[in-house]
Amino acid sequence: DVYKRQGAYISNGTILMPSYVNIGAYVDEGTMIDTWATVGSCAQIGKNVHLSGGVGIGGVLEPLQAAPVIIEDDAFVGSRCIVVEGVRVEKEAVLGANVVLTGSTKIIDVTGTKPEEFKGVIPPRSVVIPGSYTKTFPAGDFNVPCALIIGKRKESTNKKTSLNDALRTHNVAV
């Protein structure tokens, strides 16, 4: 309770390392919130989610937002990721370290023969890494950050995230 602001809901079975969960946030069972992660006001975190060290999940109060960030069940959010402005990370998606997602961040699926663009939603089971694309400005061409969907979650991805499951199953605190 030291790291939880009054008015936040944290379900039984949640592992909360030194981190912060703000007012109105909802964190469902079996979730791990690792060291120095922040869950913003009214953010919704599903079951068995892993928020790695230093993750920032935005809230709706500062700056004022109409929709909360939603991280659906069984998602994995890698170290130092930032997810803000009402972005939705759907079920079993994996965000690699340092992915930054805002409401206006281009999310580009590069798994097909032609890129497919999204904004505001990471589709289920997507594996996402930081990327960039070239954009022309009056002063020239510059690389702009984006998020790249490079595949779908596979058994090998599950093995990389399975330590969390083992710790939960055997009720081991880290």
What kind of region is each of these model predictions?
Residues 47, 51-174:
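Glycine-rich hexapeptide-repeat left-handed beta-helix
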Residues 7-10, 38-45, 71:
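Cysteine-centered iron-sulfur cluster-binding motifs in ferredoxin-type domains/subunits
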Residues 34-43, 51-57:
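Glycine- and Gly-Pro-enriched alpha-helical subdomains that act as flexible
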Residues 2-3:
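Short, small-residue-biased leader/transition segments that mark boundaries at the very start
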Residues 22-26, 42, 46-47:
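Glycine-rich phosphate/diphosphate-binding loop of Rossmann-like nucleotide-binding domains
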Residues 30:
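Glycine-rich and polybasic anion-binding loops at the starts of cofactor/ligand-binding domains
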